[in-house]
Curated annotation (Swiss-Prot):
One of its GO terms (cellular component) is Golgi membrane. Residues 309-320 have a biased composition (Low complexity). This is Casein kinase I isoform beta. Disulfide bonds: none annotated. Its EC number is 2.7.11.1. It comes from Bos taurus (Bovine). SMART domains: S_TKc (SM00220). It is an enzyme of class 2 (transferase).
Length: 336
């Protein structure tokens, strides 16, 4: 591979993965769609410069390996070095929930939000069961599967993840303050903003903010202006702390406020009651007489587009929509 800040396409990594095109970019580096030449499968290739100031790819690879076998955890195909890059090859997944939210005009139906909530809680429960916390829960880091796994939600990007408990002794990490902020400001927990060591409760609180983001279309602290990122984080933190949960969740079923209030009451080392939280939303789902048929909003929109195309042209045409059923061009590595 040629050494440059932007890797070239049409080259091999790991002796078998041919880069096709770039499909993502972030502070971590580049993400490419690639073809496995041994079986012609599409995969995602994440590239990180060996000269990066804060290398994270090896750490992320080790955590993915540690989590292998869990539902909604992408499979690692290969890790190694090519010229000036650390390389991670993994399953190619579908679009992120942020992509799909934009496709759906930045509003999800209650049915879609509740079906997603169930899977989101289960994904983070598994991660916590492996003594890890994610610390960057946000819509970009939940991706839908493709092909036979089109209805399955995947949790990705473990570059900021951390052990909260020792695997051997079971000892929980100590409560600390004065920590640097870690995460994404609009979804981060209040404790993360305050510099308090994160634990399981913080991941759960972040899920609550993501759900309300999907319900409302935006959160009250989004779009705040500030001269620096630090000042913006401070403004977001202040607004989060001064916005009552009941105000944030006003106009939506009480279960969302109940969820967030429960998470905010958790103590630092306390294990969340994942079953209780899932049940909150499952009971609401049944109360609203929804059918758990995986008819997510983007699937319904795609079907309508296909029907319109068919009726206007006289033949079925596949709509160009970012659904997990047919789009294989989005990588696991969408990151903002």
């Amino acid at each position: 591979m040629a050494s440059s800040s932007r890797p070239k396409t049409d080259v091999l990594v790991g002796g078998r993965y041919k880069l096709v095109r770039e499909i993502g970019f972030g502070s971590f580096g580049h993400v490419y769609l690639a073809i496995d030449l041994t079986n012609h499968e599409q995969v995602a290739v994440k590239l990180e410069s060996e000269n990066t100031r804060q290398p994270r790819l090896l750490h992320e690879k080790e955590l993915y390996n540690f989590l292998q076998g869990g539902v909604g955890i992408p499979q690692i195909r290969w890790y190694g070095q090519e010229t000036d890059y650390n390389v991670l090859v993994m399953d190619l997944l579908g679009p992120s929930l942020e992509d799909l939210f934009n496709f759906c005009s930045r509003r999800f139906s209650m049915k879609t939000v509740l079906m997603l909530a169930d899977q989101m809680i289960s994904r983070i429960e598994y991660v916590h069961s492996r003594n890890l916390i994610h610390r960057d829960i946000k819509p970009d880091n939940f991706l839908m599967g493709t092909g036979p796994q089109w209805k399955k939600l995947f949790l990705v990007d473990f570059g900021l993840a951390k052990k909260y408990r020792d695997n051997r002794t079971g000892q929980h990490i100590p409560h600390r303050s004065g920590k640097s902020f870690i995460g994404t400001p609009f979804c981060a927990s209040i404790s993360a903003h305050l510099g308090i060591e994160q634990s399981r409760r913080d991941d759960m609180e972040s899920i609550g903010y993501v759900l309300m983001y999907f319900n409302r279309g935006s959160l009250p602290w989004q779009g705040l202006k500030a001269a620096t990122l630090k000042q913006k984080c401070e403004k977001i933190s202040e607004m989060k702390m001064t916005t009552p949960v009941d105000v944030l969740c006003k106009g939506f079923p009480i279960e969302f406020a109940m969820y967030l209030k429960y998470c905010l009451r958790l103590s630092f080392e306390e294990a969340p009651d994942y079953r209780y939280l899932r049940q909150l939303f499952r009971l609401l789902f049944r109360k609203l007489s929804y059918q758990h048929d995986y008819a997510f909003d983007w699937i319904v929109l795609k079907q309508k587009a296909e029907q319109q195309a068919s009726s206007s042209s006289g033949e079925g045409q596949q709509a160009q929509t970012p659904t997990g059923k047919s789009d294989n061009t989005k990588s696991e590595m969408k990151h903002s």
